[in-house]
């Protein structure tokens, strides 16, 4: 079963695709956004190419589990995905995914490649793999 995950952001939205049997994700190109709103045609094309069974959207929360200002916008993004494309969307706790993504990129390639667009897509991989490991589908 193919699943696509999103690391929601106001300017960039990280994207990853994965398969539940392997429980592994692969980073795709990030999507540009304006105040959290992506080019919906780009998402439509992603869904057409990959034909996922589900979508997963990272839910940004504070370390103590409380909501952030961006939490509601991520929930709205998830709602719009479900509404526009008639596909089930899971919200998944993404606490520390960006920090973990930065650490992985830095360990692998050093500071020079620590670019924001890569961080979002690697964070989407972390969100997706975490979702695979915590769900029975």
Curated annotation (Swiss-Prot):
Stored Pfam families = RuvX (PF03652)
Q: What biological-process GO terms show up in the record?
A: rRNA 5'-end processing
The reply to whether GTP-binding figures as a keyword in the UniProt entry is no
A cellular component term, taken from the record's GO annotations: cytosol
> Which keywords, in A-to-Z order, does the entry hold?
Cytoplasm, Hydrolase, Nuclease, Ribosome biogenesis
Q: What domain of life?
A: Bacteria
> Where the protein is mainly located, per its record?
cytoplasm
Q: Which SMART domains match?
A: YqgFc (SM00732)
Give the subcellular location: Cytoplasm
Question: What EC numbers are recorded for this enzyme?
Answer: 3.1.-.-
The protein's GO terms of the molecular function aspect are: nuclease activity
Q: Which CDD domains match?
A: YqgF
Q: Does the keyword Plastid apply?
A: no
Which residues are connected by disulfide bridges in this protein? Answer: none
Per its database record, what is this protein's job? Could be a nuclease involved in processing of the 5'-end of pre-16S rRNA.
Q: What's the family?
A: Belongs to the YqgF nuclease family.
Would you tell me the protein name for this molecule?
Answer: Putative pre-16S rRNA nuclease
- What does the organism's lineage look like at the top? Bacteria, Pseudomonadati, Pseudomonadota, Gammaproteobacteria, Enterobacterales
